[in-house]
From Swiss-Prot:
Tissue expression notes: Expressed by the venom gland.
Protein name according to UniProt: Dermonecrotic toxin LspaSicTox-alphaIA1iii
Top-rank taxon: Eukaryota
Note accompanying the cofactor annotation: Binds 1 Mg(2+) ion per subunit.
Compartment(s) of residence: Secreted
Keyword tags: Cytolysis, Dermonecrotic toxin, Disulfide bond, Hemolysis, Lipid degradation, Lipid metabolism, Lyase, Magnesium, Metal-binding, Secreted, Toxin
Family annotation (InterPro entries): PLC-like_Pdiesterase_TIM-brl
Binding site for Mg(2+): E25, D27, D85
Molecular function terms from GO: lyase activity; metal ion binding; phosphoric diester hydrolase activity; toxin activity
EC number: 4.6.1.-
Cofactor: Mg(2+)
Amino acid sequence: WIMGHIVNAIGQIDEFVNLGANSIETDVSFDSNANPEYTYHGIPCDCGRNCKKWENFNDFLKGLRSATTPGDSKYKEKLVLVVFDLKTGSLYDNQANDAGKKLAKNLLQRYWNNGNNGGRAYIVLSIPDLNHYPLIKGFTDTLKQEGHPELLDKLGYDFSGNDAIGDVANAYKKAGVSGHVWQSDDITNCLLRGLTRVREAVANRDSGKGYINKVYYWTVDKRASTRDALDAGVDGIMTNYPDVITDVLNEAAYKSKFRVATYDDNPWETFKK
């Protein structure tokens, strides 16, 4: 999965997909009542990026729905996965469940069109704080209560705080999650970070008894760091430059080992070599 980083304006969806992304990451900020409010990152963000583009969350969802609904004039067949980077740092811990409920209602109505031919992309809820695990239950309970448990098939989870793998496993246990898990390992492109934790996550994924289904690494903007991440065995790379990742995937050393995921590839299944 080539994951376009900080895609917060509707116009950027086309831009990143045209550069080779089959997945995007979108920031979601919340108001003081735990309602999802804007797709906005703000300063600081990655070096060389404009971090100030934004939409109202509900407007973005409509644009995203168009881009991922077959038959729509704006449809992009390649776009199959969306990571919502939930900026829950502004919330109190006891608001997490509420935030999950409200997020689910927004997506149900404006993205999934109440289950009636809505957007088809797989969705990952990425949460920065392990203490906010109740957000997951708020979200999943709401989908069930609203009569759409089938949409849980489209839903995955990620804790993005670079916590110890064991602590993340415990948070999932508390949240009642036993699958559909992506594990991120991340640092801004302005700094360098080793691949130790990535390798640990890959080992957990491949052990057959870990909690991780997929591992992604960000932010990767250079050819050398792309090769390092691929050599470590990641499933996804988040980038500001999807064309760089595409170029490396076309190199002889990687062409036979990796391909770009399509809608038919299940993002919740651990890939068996």
